[in-house]
Amino acid sequence: MRTSSLVLFAAVAVFGAACTAAAGDESWKTIDANDRHVQDVALWAVAETDWASATGGLTLNTVDGAEKRFEAGVNYYRLTLEASSRVVAKYLRFQAVVYEEGDEHKLVSFVPIH
């Protein structure tokens, strides 16, 4: 009984890992970072983030990379961007994930990267 439980547990773990990998980064598609809509989404994300107020305001400099995922009628954008701060005299790099459904946007994450 104990051996069959371990085999079942291992099978479930492998299946779960396979499902996670299938739904992971492979579903993101690279898109044109210079596309006007991508630029608009990036501008919105920079204005929306708490980092903007914490650093005295952020200004979008460039979108260095852009990926898109379409899931259940919703667009998700994963953007690698560079912004500058009026207070911190240097360029900062961030990864932003934005949810877009119709005209509605939500900032899923906005994290600094190196």
From Swiss-Prot:
<dbReference type="GO" id="GO:0006952">
    <property type="term" value="P:defense response"/>
</dbReference>
<dbReference type="GO" id="GO:0004869">
    <property type="term" value="F:cysteine-type endopeptidase inhibitor activity"/>
</dbReference>
<keyword id="KW-0732">Signal</keyword>
<feature type="signal peptide">
    <location>
        <begin position="1"/>
        <end position="23"/>
    </location>
</feature>
<comment type="function">
    <text>Specific inhibitor of cysteine proteinases. Probably involved in the regulation of endogenous processes and in defense against pests and pathogens.</text>
</comment>
<dbReference type="InterPro" id="IPR046350">
    <property type="entry name" value="Cystatin_sf"/>
</dbReference>
<dbReference type="Pfam" id="PF16845">
    <property type="entry name" value="SQAPI"/>
</dbReference>
<dbReference type="InterPro" id="IPR027214">
    <property type="entry name" value="Cystatin"/>
</dbReference>
<keyword id="KW-0611">Plant defense</keyword>
<dbReference type="InterPro" id="IPR000010">
    <property type="entry name" value="Cystatin_dom"/>
</dbReference>
<dbReference type="GO" id="GO:0005576">
    <property type="term" value="C:extracellular region"/>
</dbReference>
<keyword id="KW-0789">Thiol protease inhibitor</keyword>
<keyword id="KW-0964">Secreted</keyword>
<keyword id="KW-0646">Protease inhibitor</keyword>
<protein>
    <recommendedName>
        <fullName>Putative cysteine proteinase inhibitor 9</fullName>
    </recommendedName>
</protein>
<comment type="similarity">
    <text>Belongs to the cystatin family. Phytocystatin subfamily.</text>
</comment>
